[in-house]
Amino acid sequence: MNILTVNLVLSTVVFAIAARLYLIPNLPKLEARSVVLPILLLHALRHLGLMFLAPGAVLPGIPEQFAYPAALGDLLAAVLALVAIPAVVRRSRLARPLVGLFNVVGTIDLIAAISLATFYGAAPYMGPAYWIPAFWVPALLVTHYVVFVLLGKRWYGPM
């Protein structure tokens, strides 16, 4: 049994239940902007994924085929979130496309990182960075889902 997979799946289930109970039912009452901004701020912290390249944060031998794409994908997602924030704050017409770009790239990054970690057996080498896929990735996956819901149903005109 892969304990990391169990942690990732169960944490995702817990975050999904929380979103379903507390956030999704309230989306019709909330302005899209008030939901998207905190999510973008959360994802702006994905630069922490660079820990997969930091000696001491991961154990020697972590597969580079996982570590580099995961770290750099997280950095790209963080930068895209930071770029989208001012557009959302200013209610720019670019807000929706920038948030959409961030959301697609960020989601693909997480799916790729999970797949690469599984394929290359990265879990035993994660060391202190283990909390990223066990806790952080599930939270990010669920918030990406929420943004897709907003982009698909609730986003009318500029934010």
Where are these regions (language model features)?
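A generic, lipid-embedded transmembrane alpha helix
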Residues: 41-55
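Membrane-interface helix-boundary motifs at transmembrane edges
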Residues: 24-36, 89-97, 155-159
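Hydrophobic transmembrane alpha-helical segments in integral membrane proteins
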Residues: 1-16
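Alpha-helical transmembrane segments in multipass membrane proteins, preferentially the mid-helix core
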Residues: 76-91, 146-150
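Juxtamembrane "helix-exit" motif on the non-cytosolic side of transmembrane helices
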Residues: 23-26, 52-61, 115-123
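C-terminal transmembrane-bundle signature of multipass membrane proteins
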Residues: 113-119, 130-157
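Hydrophobic alpha-helical membrane segments
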Residues: 73, 77-81, 98-118, 137-140
